[in-house]
Amino acid sequence: VAGKDVVEVYYKPPYTNGGIEKSSANLIEFAKTDLLQPGESQTVTVTFSIEDMASYDENNAKAYVLEKGDYAISINSDSHTVLDQKTYTADKDVVYKGENKRASDDTAATNVFEDAKGDITYLSRADHFANYEEATAAPASAELGEPYVSEYHLNSNFDKTTYLNDEDVMPTTGADNGLTLADMRDADYDDPRWEKLLDQLTVDEMANMIAMAGYQTAAMDSVGKVATLDFDGPAAINNNFTGVGSIGFPIEVVVASTWNKELAQAWGECMGKISQEMGAEGWYAPGMNTHRTAFGARNYEYFSEDGVLAGNMGAKAVEGARKYGVYSYIKHFALYEGNAKMVSVWSNEQAIREIYLKPFEISVKQGGANAVMVSWSFLGDKWTGECSNLMNTVLREEWGFRGMALTDFFRNNGHGFMNADAALANGVDVMLSTFNGEENNVANPEHPTSV
C-alpha cells in the first residue's frame, strides 16, 4: 500500500550526574516523505542548528549551555526506537550568555522566572531519580504560604496607582502630522515616522482601543485606521458576528499527528482564506500549550506534548494564515492547560523555557507570529498578563516579537484578577472585552504613565 513516512530526528546529549537536567531522547526536527509506492524510497534532507541542542542551566550559568561531549544524532521510528545514528562531538562548553547569544535570539536568555519556582521538590535525574518518592509525594499542605499570599494580586487588593510614575512626562497627543496608518505599510519597526503617527492619536481613541478589543480592534480616525474583526478559533472560524456559516476542521491534535508541515501550512491557509471571505483580519489561534495529561480540558485546542512538534506545526499555520493577510493570536501565553482561572502555576526556569514556552518561541521565531493571546493562568503569584518578564523580557526582548498582546476573554470584571492597569504596565496591549466596565478601562487615563 502506498503511503508517507515520517523522518524523526532526535538527539541524546551528554549527561553528568547531578549536572544540568537533560532528557535522553529529544526531538529536534522532523520531515515527511512524499507519497511512496511499495518498494519505493526517497532521500530526505533535514537540517537543524547545533545551538538547538543546548540545555538551559538555571543553577550555575543561568543561560543556555551546549556542554562538551558526544551528542548522538539519530533517526528514530519513535522516541525509543533508533533506526540509525551518528555522533556529533562538542570539543568545549559553549555558554550562550551576554554577547554570545544564540543566533535565534535578539538578546541572550537568563533567569527571570525564579519567583515561579515555589516551595516544590522537582524531580531530578541525579543518581537514577533518587528523589522520586519525595518529588511525587502528595504535598503536606495545600495552603499557599508567605510571601506568596501577601503578593497574590487580585482586583480586590490591587492598587491601580502601583505602576504610575509621577516623573513621567506627558507625551504628545492629537497632533496634526498628516500621516495615516496606510503610509506606514512596509515601514521598518524603527522608522521615526511611527512616533509622529503615535503623536496624532487622542487619549479617547487609545482608551477605547485598549478597553474594547473583544473580537475586534476599533477604528482610529486620527490616523485613518479602520475597524477590524477577530474571530475564534483553533478548529473553525466561528460565525459569531457574521451569520455566515464556516467549515469545521479536525482539531489540532489531529493536525499534529500527521507530522506534516506542508499540511499544517495548508490548514493555516484555509483558515486565512475563510477569514478573508468572512471579513475577519485576526484569528484567535493556533493554540500552543503543552499536553501535560490526557485529561487536559482544552487539549483539543493544542497540538502536542512535545514543544518542537507543536512549535513547528504552529509556525507553519501562522505562515499559512498570513498569506491571506490574517494575523494569528498564538495562545494561551503561557503555561495554561484548562479552563481554570486564577490557578497558580509553579515551575522552574528550565522547564518553563524548554517545555512550556518552546512552542510559542518557535512560532514567533520561525513563523513570524505577530499577535499573542495571554492566558488566564497565574505564573507564581501574579497573572501572566502582569508578568513583565514573560511579556517583555522573554517575548519581546529575547525572541524579538513585534506585535500585539491581547488578554483572554475579559467579562465585565476581568474575572476578578485581570485589569487594564496591570496589563498595560507589563506588556499587554488590549483587553478582549465586549462589555465596557471598570476593569477593562485604564483607571487614570490622563496620567502621563497611562498615556
Locate predicted features:
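Short beta-strand elements
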Residues: 81-104
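Glycoside hydrolase catalytic-domain context in secreted enzymes
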Residues: 1-58, 65-75, 79, 103-451
